[in-house]
Regions:
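Extracellular ligand-binding/catalytic regions of CAZymes and related secreted enzymes
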Residues: 105-111, 119-187
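Glycine-rich, charge-decorated loop segments at or immediately adjacent to ligand/cofactor-binding or catalytic sites
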Residues: 35-46
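Short alpha-beta junction capping motif
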Residues: 1-37, 122
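Short, solvent-exposed loop/turn segments at secondary-structure junctions
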Residues: 7, 34-36, 101-104, 121-122, ...
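Structural recognition of the beta-strand scaffold that forms the well-ordered cores
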Residues: 1-3, 26-31, 95-98, 125-129, ...
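Beta-propeller domains with acidic blade repeats across secreted/periplasmic ectodomains
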Residues: 11, 168-478
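Catalytic beta-strand/loop cores that center a nucleophilic Ser/Cys/Thr
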Residues: 49-129
Length: 478
């Protein structure tokens, strides 16, 4: 699909697109796509016409081929849109489905072709001129037009596989509950979605093309995982927190624990579960170091170690203390073992205020590092709000994310370099803080339609990723 204003296309790109469609691919150019790629005249012929001019008005595009499968379930709808006028029409293999009746200012008095389909070799093309802005895109009848058009364009076999897949999923069930927040001030709060089994939930998860999901461990063996790490033996260590975020207990004795999940028979699923340590209250991260585990357990950082080989921690010591617990949503997190043998982490607006090896530190909303034995600490990069993500590229540069409106920042020069000079804050590098989830029923609290729960910043550096991904893409949870 294309929905964009791009003036040029390379010859190689055009050859690939043309070949894709002629060999059976589906192509869905929408609205301004009919203006694109003026340097390739053949592109207009593939689309079926080219945008020439427009005004703007409230109008209803009229259906003229109601029986066509690309209009299955589609109703006419009225909305403000740009009143496209096309030229360079290619009527070969084209069927016009909807038209816009002539209106004042049009260069002609005939109905203007508005939505059409055409065939190109073995492939199919669906085009609609609708879609200038949210006045159209927010319309449920436009959603149906796009859905029906896409399902026609992909072809009958792909559509049949899609419908078979939908039929295999357990239907989602909802119920109204009084305690569901309505921060967005919708006319009605979103209903509560009843839970699915992990297996059924995976069917509702969309993975990138070429990727697949595999279930390694799930409830009831692990509960409320808040962080995990893989060890050198391929075992998954999971930090479980049933107390997070509201059950902050006096003395910090709680119900949370670290659990080792192991696949003992090589079938790709965990079948052995061992509690390494328990009795914690809202731990938020862990990292392997010094033959054991360092656990973020505000206000303290703990070192845990198994000394007798039974996979249970029998040594527990406090490395340092000082992290705030005023808001459990804003404490330390995302511990990572750095290339320089320091431990890196993030903290939000529940800041660190304490001493490490006799030196006073006071910082918040940024990244820090410390030595694995707790003998030294440094605050590295200041950012502007609740910091919950850190990651390294292959060169060891530090990147991160914040909960609100800043899904990706570059650490740059650390504060330790500046000494007494004015320091430079980390800089946002994301092109936009906007958040585009696949499902529509997303509850947000602060930055509506943008990142309001951003966390993590893991670069795709493994050789298991496509070459085009490596060191060029990062995963940030929303």
């Amino acid at each position: 699909s294309i929905y964009a204003n791009h003036p040029r296309l390379t010859a190689k790109q055009w050859k690939n697109l043309q070949s894709y469609v002629r060999n059976g691919g589906g192509f869905v150019p929408v609205h301004c796509a009919s203006w694109c790629f003026s340097n390739i005249p053949e592109f207009d012929q593939l689309v079926g016409g080219r945008f020439k001019s427009h005004q703007g008005a409230d109008f209803t595009a009229r259906v003229v081929k109601k029986e066509h499968p690309a209009l299955s379930g589609v109703k006419e709808f009225k909305a403000w849109d740009e009143t496209y006028f096309h030229h360079r029409h290619n009527e070969k293999g084209r069927t016009v489905l909807m038209v816009r009746d002539a209106m004042p200012g049009d260069p002609h008095t005939k109905p203007e072709p508005w939505t059409w389909v055409r065939t190109e070799g073995k492939g199919r093309v669906f085009y609609t001129a609708s879609g200038h802005d949210q006045r159209v895109w927010n319309h449920t009848d436009f959603h149906q037009l796009m859905k029906s058009g896409i399902l026609w364009a992909v072809g009958d076999k792909a559509k049949a596989r899609y419908e078979k897949f939908l039929a295999s999923r357990v239907p989602l069930k909802y119920e109204k509950r009084d305690n569901v927040p309505n921060y967005e001030r919708r006319p009605e709060p979103l209903p509560y979605q009843l839970p699915l089994s992990p297996e059924e939930s995976m069917k509702y998860t969309q993975a990138p093309v070429g990727f697949r999901l595999e279930l390694f461990a799930s409830e009831p063996e692990i509960i409320n995982p808040i962080y995990f790490q893989w060890d050198e033996r391929g075992r998954l260590w999971v930090v479980e927190s049933v107390d997070y975020p509201n059950e902050l207990k006096p003395g910090r004795k709680g119900n949370d624990r670290i659990k080792i999940c192991e696949d003992t028979n090589g079938d790709g699923k965990a079948d052995k579960f061992t509690v390494f340590a328990d009795g914690f209250n809202i731990p938020t991260s862990m990292v392997f170091a010094r033959g054991g585990v360092i656990l973020a357990h505000a206000p303290e950082f703990l070192f845990l170690k198994d000394t007798d080989g039974d996979d249970k921690a029998d040594q527990r010591e406090v490395l340092f203390t000082g992290f705030g617990v005023g808001d459990t949503h804003a404490g330390p997190s995302n511990l990572r073992y750095g290339f320089d043998n320091w431990i890196y982490g993030t903290v939000g607006y529940s800041p660190f205020n304490g001493e490490v090896n006799g030196e006073k530190h006071n910082f918040g909303s940024g990244t820090f590092r410390f030595r694995p034995d707790g003998s030294d600490m440094e605050f590295l990069h200041q950012f502007n709000n609740n910091t919950w993500g850190i990651g390294f590229n292959e060169a060891g540069d530090v990147f991160g994310s914040t909960a609100n409106n800043n899904p990706s920042f570059f650490g740059g020069i650390p504060n330790t370099v500046f000494g007494s000079q004015r320091r430079m804050s980390a800089k946002m590098i994301a092109s936009s803080p906007k958040f585009h989830p696949i499902p529509p029923n997303i509850r947000q609290v602060d930055a509506f339609n943008a990142y309001t729960a951003g966390c993590g910043h893991a670069f795709a550096t493994s050789s298991g990723f496509p070459k085009s991904w490596r060191d060029r893409r990062a995963f940030v949870c929303g």
